[in-house]
Design a protein with these regions (language model features):
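Select transmembrane alpha-helical segments in multipass membrane proteins
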Residues: 1-7, 36-37, 99-119, 156-159, ...
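Helix-loop-helix module between adjacent transmembrane segments
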Residues: 1-46, 215-224
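Membrane-water interface regions at transmembrane-helix termini and the short interhelical loops
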Residues: 20-25, 38-60, 236-237, 263-271
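Selective recognition of specific alpha-helical transmembrane segments in multi-pass small-molecule
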Residues: 36-50, 61-81, 115-117, 140-169, ...
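Helix-loop-helix hairpins and the membrane-proximal interhelical loops
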Residues: 52-113
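Extracellular/periplasmic helix-exit of transmembrane alpha-helices
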Residues: 72-89, 103, 133-134, 148-191
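Juxtamembrane helix-boundary/capping and inter-helix hinge elements in multi-pass membrane proteins
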Residues: 122, 132-144, 152, 237-244
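Terminal cytosolic tails of multi-pass membrane transporters
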Residues: 277, 284-338
Length: 338
């Protein structure tokens, strides 16, 4: 239920808002036009089913990451002399060593955790849904891949955004009382526009901001396909795969997507945080209840790896009933090797 309400309803409008803002800033595209076109294109994909989602999202994900990292490298090269100061500022601010920001350390930590979890989805349980269809001989393999994805998302992609913003100097910092401690971005709303205007200030012309707008569309498009996959999976579980339920979540999801251009940024963030919190609380409780079993599965994986074997999983060894038969082949392989 939390998976349906989070990715399917409360968390998706914010991303459409980001697309509309960067497209308006780069090309002057009206918000309603951006929202309508994005919703229609996404609707074509999600109505094509889960297989179409997988075939489209993989190449787009690779392309968008490459584009974004190339832009970041360009900013870093052009501002190489500023990089030591940028990283010093990051660490000083993080640990309250920068006098200007010391008073808002708690707020900084709070916002960092909220936005970080929103980005990498750590602890929400959504990663398990996304990787469940993969074919692997041992669940620990896929678990390690998911850990790597969180690392890449947080320490590579999110850090790239930080480098662009801090190197360009285009940002505001708000104090605990709402006043601006640092005001270098004027009235520009916080978020993706800091990155876009930061790029425009580093590279000549507005081409980099336009490239970012296109990359953002790709980022959000693939992300929303993932959101829909999670929501549909939850709906299928609740209603045993009934077609009416699937079409209902499609309609609700696409309506929520379009609502992003009709609502204010603050309200969308509040809705998104609610969805993230809803998923995380339920999932973290489940993680704590299953931690002993997970540890045993990881030990099994490591023991087989140390022997030079390709780890195979037998759910019966851990008291797990495999009603689908998904692990039968690997369980048999493990028994034959014993």
């Amino acid at each position: 239920l939390a998976t349906v309400l989070g990715p399917g309803v409360t968390m998706c409008g914010l991303h459409t808002n980001s697309i509309a803002s960067v497209m308006d800033n780069a090309f002057g595209t009206p918000w309603l036009v951006s929202g309508a076109l994005f919703t229609i294109c996404l609707g074509i994909v999600v109505c094509g089913g889960i297989k179409r989602i997988g075939s489209i999202s993989e190449p787009m994900s690779i392309a968008m990451c490459i584009i974004y990292l190339i832009l970041t490298i360009g900013v870093a090269v052009l501002n190489a002399s500023a990089l030591p100061g940028v990283f010093a500022l990051i660490f000083k601010s993080a640990f309250g060593l920068e006098p200007v920001f010391a008073g808002i350390m708690g707020s900084t930590l709070n916002w960092g955790i909220k936005r970080g979890v929103y980005s990498n989805e750590a602890g929400q349980g959504s990663g398990a849904i996304m990787c469940a269809p993969t074919e692997t001989s041992h669940p620990a393999k896929q678990g390690l891949v998911q850990v790597l994805s969180i690392f890449v998302d947080t320490l590579v992609i999110c850090s790239a955004s930080a480098v662009i913003i801090l190197c360009s100097g285009f940002y505001n910092v708000q104090g605990a009382d709402g006043s601006l401690i640092v005001s270098q971005a004027g009235d520009t709303p916080y978020g993706i526009l800091y990155v876009q205007e930061g790029l425009n200030s580093v590279f000549p012309g507005n081409w980099s901001g336009m490239v970012l707008a296109i990359a953002t569309v790709l980022f959000v498009f693939t992300g929303m396909m993932g959101y829909y996959y999670q929501a549909e999976s939850g709906m299928n579980y609740l209603f045993k795969g009934k077609r009416g339920a699937v079409w209902a979540i499609r309609a609700i999801f696409l309506t929520s997507i379009f609502s992003g251009v009709l609502m204010e940024n603050e309200g969308l963030w509040a809705l998104g945080d609610t969805g993230v919190g809803l998923m995380a609380w339920f999932n973290i409780i489940a993680i704590l209840l299953m931690c002993k079993q997970v540890k045993a599965i990881m030990v099994d994986f490591e023991e087989q790896s140390k022997k030079g074997l390709d780890p195979c999983f037998d759910p019966s060894e851990f008291g797990i009933e495999d009603t689908t038969g998904a692990w039968d082949r690997y369980a048999e392989q493990k028994k034959q090797r014993s």
